[in-house]
Amino acid sequence: MNSETLKSMLQQGQDNLLLRYGLGQALVNEKRHSEAVEHFQKALEFDPDHSSSWKLLGKVFVELNEYPRAIETYEQGIHVAERCGDLQAAKEMKVFLKRLKKQAV
């Protein structure tokens, strides 16, 4: 779904983890990264253990050249993913974090 459809659902009073995550994803796909931040953050308010939201929020911060926030987000996301047993997400975020730290040097 595109972001406008998802925003319409939000305006109609629907608000939950999957709607916010989906809206964040749609905005990323539309290259509207700064708008996506709030929706991934809201998704994490619904479920702080949602590894995919941490991962995409980190990617958004990278796209926005907000590297310290991206590093912090990936570090938190890795901790959450490992604690919850989401080893694939943890592995991916570790790779992204390693690349980001190399790039920042």
Regions found by a protein language model. Name each.
Residues 9, 42-43, 77:
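Canonical positions in the second alpha-helix
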